[in-house]
Amino acid sequence: MDSRRRSPTVTAKAAAGELPLAPHEGQNQQPSIPRSSDVLPLPLYLANGVFFTLFFSVMYFLLTRWREKIRNATPLHVVTLSELAALASLIASVIYLVSFFGLDFVQSLIYKPNNEGWEIEEEILMVEDSRNGTNCTTLGCAVPPPSVPKIAPVVPQQPSKMVIIEKPAPLITPQNSEEDEDIIKAVVAGKIPSYSLESKLGDCKRAAGIRREALQRITGKSLEGLPLEGFDYASILGQCCEMPVGYVQLPVGIAGPLLLDGREYMLPMATTEGCLVASTNRGCKAILASGGANSVLLRDGMTRAPVVRFGTAKRAAELKFYMEDTQNFETISVVFNKSSRFAKLQSVQCAIAGKNLYIRFSCSTGDAMGMNMVSKGVQNVLEFLQTDYPDMDVLGISGNFCADKKPAAVNWIEGRGKSVVCEAIIKEEIVKTVLKTEVAALIELNMVKNLAGSAIAGALGGFNAHASNIVSAIFIATGQDPAQNVESSQCITMMEAVNDGKDLHISVTMPSIEVGTVGGGTQLASQSACLNLLGVKGASKDSPGANSRLLATIVAGSVLAGELSLMSAISAGQLVRSHMKYNRSSKDITNIASSQLESDS
């Protein structure tokens, strides 16, 4: 605000000996507007003090005179010389104060800050950091400003064996504008934190490009194969990813149609594993030819379990009894449900370990996956309990009794997210013609592999062939959290003979499918398109939570198809042959190695 003490047009060059961070070409420069305080000969603090004192003094004088005229019935328009002087002083002080303080506020709303308006103090701190830095080469920290070496093409050493990968591409850097080049050098030197580029530049794509180039210069490694163009970086700002330098391309295959609950679905699967989409597609074909699959949603509730500590185990038990008392549930629900109109507390489960109490809250979350929603509700309850339990020490909003992104028996038994069971009856003819195996062989293999074999391995929720394959592929395609594949893939696959032993009954039971159709990565363009393909894009307008529940049943139905096909391939001895045919690189490694040796010699 003080133009004589802190000028927004002072450049970094004057402060740190470097070029200023100029705005991108095409951006307008912020005009330098004079202020009333610049024309006064007094120091700024004296000028402000004089006009503040003058304003309040004449205001007090005029109000006093106004009250006296009212008491004496004197006309208000009759003024004395002193009153005229007071009015003039009031107007002058108002003009000064408004021009000094008011214009700054208006200008901050009208004029967008540019790169030259960055705070001089921040640039001085950056210079100090660069002087004090030692061997730090991280993008977000300060490093000494060494001269940037020229990056030569990366050439691998002469190998001793014939197995050679393709020659890496040389480090090709695009032509940057002069102002971008200055910013890149400042990031490399550690004078500008890489994480602040988006907020400073106001252009997410430009920030990603500058960060990418700085990363290449710091590491000496090329990112030529990592695409930068063709992505909306503003869509991930503050939501999906920090400090982006590009995006990874993943192929998306389509399996189906999957006939589930009387409706057909085409399944988008993002994967780099050959045979996975083809195998799932074969399972869908067998299910479709047998009349389809049916699903049942058993539970729908996201959980969060904070951990609190008391001075004694007795005191912790008192809170446990209070939380699990049904008479107190309504009170707790009212406090919890304030977090969102979609949040509805379902249950509270407590566990004690010494003086520590773990409180597992479960609530419905609409069409969102719901982790943030349930966490907000838990925070509300903890603040409410603090009144009656002031000795309660909240150690963490999550105490791993939830349990999130970890294989846990509590999820396997109690469920987390959506609990779904999906089943189908596969006709004997389809088992023979499409799956190329026998019903009896499938049942025996399922028992010795998925049940007995998993038990011998000590599996926790892993009584299946490859549920994780299908879950992760659909999760990535539809913008779910891939890390929650850990508990979402917990599945037990059951097979038995029906209809006098002729047909096969197959089912998958999945107690912890954690999905959502709003929030997180679901709002990205590619992932949103995949959700739209399934008919579950966004929030359900008719019934909150219907889209996320439908997505969970589709995931379970897809797992059913994948389990059916893989188990059939193993039973028929086709697994190795199919993977050798479809899951190997088509590149001739020997020819690549020979050409590589010739080019290097």
Curated annotation (Swiss-Prot):
Region span, Catalytic: 180-601
Keywords (A to Z) from UniProt: Endoplasmic reticulum, Glycoprotein, Isoprene biosynthesis, Membrane, NADP, Oxidoreductase, Transmembrane, Transmembrane helix
CDD domains in UniProt: HMG-CoA_reductase_classI (cd00643)
Protein's UniProt name: 3-hydroxy-3-methylglutaryl-coenzyme A reductase
Subcellular localization(s) per the UniProt record: Endoplasmic reticulum membrane
Glycosylation sites: 337, 583
Region spans: Disordered: 1-34
Reactions catalysed: (R)-mevalonate + 2 NADP(+) + CoA = (3S)-3-hydroxy-3-methylglutaryl-CoA + 2 NADPH + 2 H(+)
Function: Catalyzes the synthesis of mevalonate. The specific precursor of all isoprenoid compounds present in plants.
Principal location: endoplasmic reticulum
Region (Linker): 107-179
Active site: 273, 405, 481, 579
UniProt pathway annotation: Metabolic intermediate biosynthesis; (R)-mevalonate biosynthesis; (R)-mevalonate from acetyl-CoA: step 3/3
Name of the top EC class for this enzyme: oxidoreductase
BP term (GO), one: sterol biosynthetic process
Membrane topology: Multi-pass membrane protein
GO molecular function: hydroxymethylglutaryl-CoA reductase (NADPH) activity
InterPro entries associated with the record: HMG_CoA_Rdtase, HMG_CoA_Rdtase_cat_sf, HMG_CoA_Rdtase_CS, HMG_CoA_Rdtase_eu_arc, HMG_CoA_Rdtase_N, HMG_CoA_Rdtase_NAD(P)-bd_sf, HMG_CoA_Rdtase_sub-bd_dom_sf
